[in-house]
């Protein structure tokens, strides 16, 4: 928002007009070739991971190329923090919002330029327009946070998440690139170097703090978080712009220039590379390999391939590059990658193994629940449930084993279930006076941040005469967080006789063979993972039955 608006203001200052066609042409050559290169390069790597990551990959590619990923994710009910099978091109949702901004804002600024305003009045008109659009967009996000249950709309929607661009546009009218304001020039003269650096570093620190204290599904994130993050980012931009004019004799470090040039490419490549490599190796090694390959391919794209497509001479940091001997190889490689991408897209399943398994398990769970309901209605005393298992997708994955080993247990499991979602099911049973004597809480992977208060609400609402079994969560990618949840649950079991722990975390650690080729949360179905999971819970239930219930 800042850079595009500042450049448009500079163009109007020079020409007293805006060339809309040239604007869109520049945006096309900057945005489209890199995203095509990213898709072509990353597609062969998908052959290294399980087919869950290429399920419906063709639709994801079409959404990315059409700059509609944000709406695609909204319509399929996706979650940005889906940690099981994240879409490889999910990150292009923000690029989609950016392109929507370019189209709308470019046309609006062009229309304003047709009013034949003076440069000062033109800047003022942009300020008023961007201010109105900023508050309108922020208001949409603010109000929607009270109305929508699925935060994906607020997060992905162009209407609610484009307001930061307009805040950047506001700051562009207050400073600029070539044509700057008198107020900005005075600030550069009056502000000390220390003050400028303090504003930059302080804003950056506050931005980091927001990243630690706010969560994706937290209401405060949408009420104030994104607005504050945008403000701190703009303060950093303003400080960096002032620093540039404050130190005119100091050249920008070459390293900074290099990464500035290829930052868009790194943004495009890093996500699919990390998702793929994190399935194959440790987190630190996946991060290192992601950084190296993202940097290499982003540099190749920016300095070599993009200039070739635009008909320009390739240059790297001002040094001319002779790539004529390599053109045939580059074109040939692109053709081969395109064929590979098409084959993978057409051969990809609509549903991956994990999604298919979840669908089958959900149907099995529904059928089992119906049978138990019918048996209770018929008055079969032996079918009375004394155990309710409220679980997430790991419990859902174990549905068949639960049915065979614990046929009288009622399973209520769903994908991506958090503590809050589990509490709704728990409280419904409490209010209806249908809560079984033993409640098994098998969640935690999807909401590890506020686990103390989340778990405490179950203890507070558990009626007298009941027992609670806590299943420790396990996620190989978030071992530190999972360990903290486990330690807390073990402490609760020591402090409360009616609380028992089913230590799935420790069982998972003791059986590394069940995790081969998985996401580190859902055991491989080709192993005895389901037996281990159910047995861990069954043993804990047996142990709980020998302990006092709440209030006894």
Question: Model segments located where?
Answer:
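Residues at alpha-helix caps and immediate loop-helix transition turns in enzyme cores, especially N-
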Residues: 220, 251, 451-454, 481-485, ...
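A short helix->loop->beta-strand "cap" motif at the edges of active sites that frequently abuts
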Residues: 464-467
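Cell-envelope and extracellular/periplasmic
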Residues: 440-445
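A general structural detector for well-ordered alpha-helical segments in enzyme core domains, enriched
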Residues: 158, 454-458, 485-489
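Extracellular/periplasmic envelope-modification machinery, especially enzymes
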Residues: 189, 295, 307-437, 448, ...
């Amino acid at each position: 928002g800042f850079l595009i608006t500042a450049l448009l203001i500079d163009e109007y200052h020079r020409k007293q007009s805006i060339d809309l066609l040239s604007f869109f042409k520049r945006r096309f050559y900057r945005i489209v070739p890199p995203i095509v290169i990213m898709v072509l390069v990353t597609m062969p790597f998908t052959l290294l991971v399980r087919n869950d990551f290429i399920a419906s990959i063709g639709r994801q590619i079409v959404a990315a190329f059409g700059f509609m990923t944000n709406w695609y994710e909204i319509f399929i009910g996706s979650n940005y923090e889906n940690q099981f099978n994240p879409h490889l091109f999910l990150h292009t949702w923000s690029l989609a919002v950016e392109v929507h901004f370019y189209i709308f804002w470019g046309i609006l600024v062009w229309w304003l330029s047709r009013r034949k305003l003076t440069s000062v009045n033109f800047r003022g008109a942009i300020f008023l327009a961007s201010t109105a659009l900023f508050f309108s967009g922020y208001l949409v996000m603010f109000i929607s946070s009270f109305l929508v249950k699925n935060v994906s709309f607020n997060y992905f929607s162009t209407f609610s998440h484009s307001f930061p661009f307009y805040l950047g546009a506001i700051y562009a009218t207050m400073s600029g690139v070539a044509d700057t304001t008198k107020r900005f020039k005075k600030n550069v003269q009056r502000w000390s170097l220390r003050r400028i650096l303090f504003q930059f570093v302080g804003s950056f620190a506050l931005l980091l703090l927001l990243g630690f204290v706010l969560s994706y599904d937290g209401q405060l994130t949408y009420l104030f978080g994104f607005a504050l993050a945008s403000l701190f980012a703009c303060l950093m931009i303003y400080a960096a712009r002032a620093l540039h004019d404050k130190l005119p004799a100091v050249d920008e470090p070459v390293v900074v220039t290099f990464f500035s040039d290829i930052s868009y490419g790194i943004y495009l490549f890093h996500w699919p590379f990390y998702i793929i490599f994190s399935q194959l190796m440790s987190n630190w090694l996946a991060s290192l390999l992601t950084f190296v390959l993202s940097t290499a391919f982003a540099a190749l794209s920016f300095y070599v391939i993009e200039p070739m497509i635009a008909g320009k001479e390739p240059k790297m940091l001002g040094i001319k590059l002779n790539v004529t001997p390599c053109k045939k190889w580059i074109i040939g490689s692109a053709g081969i990658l395109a064929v590979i991408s098409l084959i993978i897209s057409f051969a990809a399943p609509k549903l991956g193994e994990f999604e298919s398994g979840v669908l089958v398990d959900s149907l099995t769970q529904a059928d089992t629940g119906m049978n138990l309901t019918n048996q209770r209605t018929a008055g079969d005393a032996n079918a009375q449930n004394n155990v309710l298992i409220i679980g997430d997708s790991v419990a859902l994955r174990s549905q068949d084993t639960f049915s065979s080993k614990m046929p009288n247990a009622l399973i209520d499991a769903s994908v991506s279930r958090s503590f809050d979602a589990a509490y709704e099911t728990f409280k419904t049973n409490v209010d209806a006076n249908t809560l079984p004597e033993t409640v098994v809480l098998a969640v935690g992977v999807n909401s590890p941040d506020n686990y103390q208060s989340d778990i405490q609400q179950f203890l507070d609402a558990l009626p007298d005469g009941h027992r609670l079994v806590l299943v420790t969560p396990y996620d190989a990618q978030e071992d530190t967080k999972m360990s903290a949840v486990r330690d807390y649950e073990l402490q609760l079991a020591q402090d409360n006789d009616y609380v028992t722990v089913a230590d799935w975390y420790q069982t998972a650690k003791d059986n590394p063979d069940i995790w081969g080729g998985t996401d580190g949360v859902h055991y491989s179905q080709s192993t005895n993972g389901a037996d281990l999971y159910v047995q861990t819970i069954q043993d804990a239930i047996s142990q709980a039955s020998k302990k006092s219930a709440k209030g006894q």
